């Protein structure tokens, strides 16, 4: 930003200098008397360094004046933002909103629905097998050995499960799948016999 201001001021100074040279003949005579010296009928022109140094000094003075004028306004702006603490408001915009659940009257965060992992799904090491006989109602479990990849996957699922246990899920999301039945005409036929 300072470079942009410097270039703008430099352009203004150069444009002003060009306009001053061509504006009036009196000013051009004064400039010529100041800049040129005649010694023994030889005109000595000022070097480019002298011209450049005078323009640069003016530009530097102008930039310092602009910077000194900008500092109080920057301080006022920073004090304004510190006073109102806008950063807290911006942080609040990125957080999830708090929603009241009408079924359990608990505060829950409105996160996108992420399917939860049940503890039954996490126990991959035990597979349940049922005996196909009608007499027996017992359920036998058979233990299997897990490979390293399956163990790593199991650990990952356990971490996910522990992480999502920290969220307060609404009660209706937990119980919807338990009470939901398929709607078919055969389930709802009332017999009047």
Curated annotation (Swiss-Prot):
According to the UniProt record, which cysteines are disulfide-bonded?
none
Cellular-component GO terms for this entry: extracellular space
Q: Does the keyword Cytoplasm apply?
A: no
Give the location in the cell. Answer: Secreted
Q: What is its main location?
A: secreted
Functional summary from the UniProt entry = Important role in the capacity of milk to transport calcium phosphate.
What is this protein's name? Answer: Alpha-S2-casein
Q: Which organism is it from?
A: Camelus dromedarius (Dromedary)
Gene name of this polypeptide? CSN1S2
